[in-house]
Amino acid sequence: MKFGKSLSSQIVEMQPEWRDNFLSYKDLKKRLNLISGGAAGERASKRRRVGGATAVTVTAAAAGGMTLEQAGFVGLLDAELDKFNFFFLEKEEEYVIKQKELRERKMASAEEVMRVRKEIVDLHGEMVLLENYSALNYTGLVKILKKYDKRTGSMIRLPFVQKVLQQPFFTTDLLYKLVKECEEMLDQLMPTNEHSVASEDGKDDSEGEEKGSKPSSSSSANGGAVPGEAEDERSTDMKSTVTAALRALREIRSGSSTVSVFSLPPLHGSNGQDEPGR
């Protein structure tokens, strides 16, 4: 499956608040198609821009050796980075606060512990999705930059990707640490509830093909310890979304046998989380 279709199918699976914060891959491709390739196209583009752009914009584009269309494309890429960073940092802060709250609640009564365990499971799933968000957007940027270089004969992919590597949305060390702490909390809670959740854990082991999907089935097999059908449905949706996200990410990372400086590391093991944060 081509990346654009894979990304689109992934976005459809996400919660509404996530959907508009992924890479605008289609818009970037449309903008790229407005850029004429080669020297003749560059001359024509320069003629077009003189009448329709401000002197400041033309001067800035010319100073960078770009046509107006090229400068607009790069400007759109920079806007995408700002969008990724804002969303990623907002989510990361939300997860830090939520995890601290769950850590403080996990020593409560048996009934409350079951509720906390379910919330940890859901939080774990959302953090896995945010890791996936980071990797998908990075991959999309690399692919669209490759198309840009090929069309224009420019070589902006390497310097732009070097800038991307320093962006908050790509720096997942803290997120990786939070994911591991979630797993440790789940391990600590398991002995406390081993009698009441033994049956659901057996089900988890058989169904948990991906990390994040394993614990997410807890809400559907706890004998009513977690009230609310809406909550059960949300956990089921989360499990499905995480599983689809990891499957798409595996497909993207293993889609080419050619390894380059721009390649993401492969996913190892069945849970997709053996690699350290970037």
From Swiss-Prot:
CDD domains: SPX_AtSPX1_like. Keywords: Nucleus. Its main location: nucleus. Residues 1-162 form the SPX domain. One of its GO terms (cellular component) is nucleus. Inhibits PHR2 DNA-binding activity via a phosphate (Pi)-dependent protein interaction. Together with SPX1, plays a negative role in the regulation of leaf inclination by preventing RLI1 transcription factor activity in Pi depleted conditions. This is SPX domain-containing protein 2. It comes from Oryza sativa subsp. indica. The lineage of its organism: Eukaryota, Viridiplantae, Streptophyta, Embryophyta, Tracheophyta. The gene is SPX2.
